Amino acid sequence: MECEREVSEVSVPVSPSGQYLNSSVLSLSILAVLESEIPIDDSQTMSLLKNVFLPINPRFSSIMVEGKKGVKKWKRVEVKLEDHINVPRFAEGMSLEFYDKNFNDYLSKISLDQFPHNQPLWEIHIIKYPTSNAAGNVIFKLHHALGDGFSLMGALLSCLQRADNPAIPLTFPSRQSNSKKECKTTSIFKCVPKIFTRVINTVQDFGWSYMKSRFVEDDRSPIRSGEGGFRATTITTLTFSLDCVKQIKAKLKVTINDVITGIIFLGTRLYMEETSHESGKASSTALVLFNTRAIGGYKSISEMVKPNAEMPWGNRFTFLQVPIPKLANAGDAADESSSNPLRFVMKAHHLIKRKRNSAAVYLIGTMLDTLRKLRGPEATARYLHSTLKNSSLGISNLIGPVEPMTLANYPVRGLYFTVNGGPEDLSITVVSYVEKLRVAVRMDKSFIDPQKFNSCIEKAFDMIFRAAVESTSPAISSTKVSNKNKKEIKSS
């Protein structure tokens, strides 16, 4: 069955970042997994895609073609929906463990598959078999050239409704920043030194970022083989209580992002130390991705695609290269301030705040644009590939809705996403949904032990929560959460 759409003769240029992310050296895709509480009937799929998904954005009905001078453009085409829908068949009547393994193997396989060049860059995979986490799963595979996580999450949410009242829009946790008010409430004598410090930090951060991307690789370690290339991966998930994370946030007066990053940093170092004691001294860097929009919540797609939109559609992200603090017992090179687990959160807070307050992230964007104009998108893609390859870990997070939601009247039990196609051995993505934080870990299947790594992340969460809360009753609560999380670590 074809989706009847008029093919436009006008081709729209692909954004610069879209060209970087779909090149001969770098081709990134996003897997978004929606877990259903009830078994899935795929009979509504065609109508949902035709009437709801395709109209969201013309890019979902376009292919990427190369024009004059190698400039890529979006060209509208007729969409054959059956070419984009995949419903795999597994053996019937098997155990949940059997379907867990089959689902994980299938997820690993499609994460490596490339999109055909002659059709729009998206797919949907419907898994109608139960797993330990859900009665069924719907997987959206979307090429990163279509948009970043913010854009694509907004697109998916356009297909979803509130479970309690579909007429009311989904709501999201507020994200407020006082950075803009900082100098308004501070005397000019205190503000000038801060501006001077930011200038110095900008020069240092930009120079260090350039060196890390071009010349300086992280040490080889239990989380970085240094081999590059594309190998089979495995994707596992963990679930944490958002309320517990908020308790840590309130105690330390930091952001939820700082808490998440601190937990990941500590858990990663614990894994490295347990795997190889000498690796505690390894120099390791995390590539922390963040959105450059002034996010206050997701906008409707109609608002995002307007000219000069406040929060426009597309790829509007940049990265921070943040050194992962070392454990205090890792030798002379250790960061002595990290002996307390809370120091990992505070270290993440100070490093990220310092780097975000410098203009280095914007200079990096300007440099990439200049590189594209002078040497073309392929050269820019090689620079980004080198940035990923020289780092040990990628971290990205998104805000999800506060209320339970449904997809075509199917209650969504949980959701998570991963970014695939990069040369790094380890990538961690986080999304919130109904007072839960879902952490997805994509790792090299032959190099990193998934159970051990997840156990170390869980241990880091427990250590930081206990240290932050301090009193007896919350500590008991922490133990309960930790035990629950141990049951929720699944190979998804």
Question: Which residue stretches match the model-derived regions?
Answer:
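Generic start-of-chain signal for non-secretory N-termini
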Residues: 1-29
